[in-house]
């Protein structure tokens, strides 16, 4: 199988991310589990551009976000056909959707750091 340049793979991932985000935001995906509050964080496209893993998160909570990911997984065929037309690809990568906890983890870590800093400031003034 032919390897594709890393730059092209990255650009394709960014285009896929933007198109899927727009489909979600505009309500083009009719599955009721897919909320406009879902966020497509990034897309990992395989070197041969055969598969793409789409990382999704939301501030709505773990259960609702996982439901949204399942809705996207159910609509993967529709999304893939839209992508193939918009991106003018001979073969659009197979899509898989993954619940991404990295944003939630980062937010939690940031809050912990803020609490430590504010606690440190209070003890300095005491």
Swiss-Prot record:
Cellular component, GO, one term: cytosol
Compartments, record wording: Cytoplasm
GO molecular function: ribosomal small subunit binding
Domain of life: Bacteria
Database matches in PANTHER family: RIBOSOME-BINDING FACTOR A, CHLOROPLASTIC-RELATED
Record's subunit section: Monomer. Binds 30S ribosomal subunits, but not 50S ribosomal subunits or 70S ribosomes.
Name of the protein in its database record: Ribosome-binding factor A
Organism listed in the record: Treponema pallidum (strain Nichols)
